[in-house]
A protein has these predicted regions:
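Glycine/tyrosine- and acidic-biased, solvent-exposed loop/turn segments at the edges of beta-strands
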Residues: 1-172
Length: 172
């Protein structure tokens, strides 16, 4: 292993990335930029296996922030829309497995849903709101029952468009 501090540049001379590298692989602290010069990603080495990652959209708004442990999302992660409004927030166990209470927001800043994750399925009360803040659905879901939520939302009068948004919020 031959670790070197390197700086890479775009053809226009703008910095692309810099930090410690093992060959072409970033190791530890690392920063990258968009070709426009705006910061894209910052990685701060917390321990040998934990790195704090912060990502930005090209417009300068923060995109996501959280810790990677052994290359997987771990602990509290927060995500934002490119307009600066919060998109989602919740906890990961090892290997990107969601756990506990997760919150999801519509792009206009209104709360979209709150639910309890157990892995990638539900395990508890899930509440959904439309883009104007009206509660549209609330129900306890256990394990694989969360897959039934889409039909239950439609039965409660949610449009296909709104149901599709919830799917993207929860599973993307």
């Amino acid at each position: 292993m031959s670790i070197k501090y390197l700086t890479f540049y775009y053809p226009n001379g703008q910095k692309k990335s810099e930090g410690n590298y093992d060959g072409q692989e970033p190791i530890g602290d690392h920063t990258s930029w968009f070709e426009s010069g705006n910061i894209k990603c910052e990685a701060v080495d917390l321990t040998e296996s934990k790195i704090l990652f912060t990502h930005w959209y090209e417009n300068g708004q923060m995109k996501s922030k959280g810790v990677h442990k052994d290359y997987f999302e771990s602990g509290l992660w927060t995500y934002w829309y490119d307009n600066g409004n919060k998109k989602s927030e919740g906890f990961y166990l090892d290997k990107d497995e969601r756990v506990g209470k997760w919150k999801f927001w519509h792009s206009n800043g209104e709360l979209a849903c709150i639910g309890i994750h157990k892995g990638w399925s539900g395990d508890g009360l899930w509440t959904f709101w439309d883009e104007t803040g009206n509660k549209v659905h609330e129900r306890e879901y256990r394990e694989s029952e969360l897959l039934d939520v889409w039909e239950n939302l439609r039965a409660d009068g949610c449009s296909d468009e709104l149901v599709d948004k919830y799917k993207k919020y929860i599973f993307n």
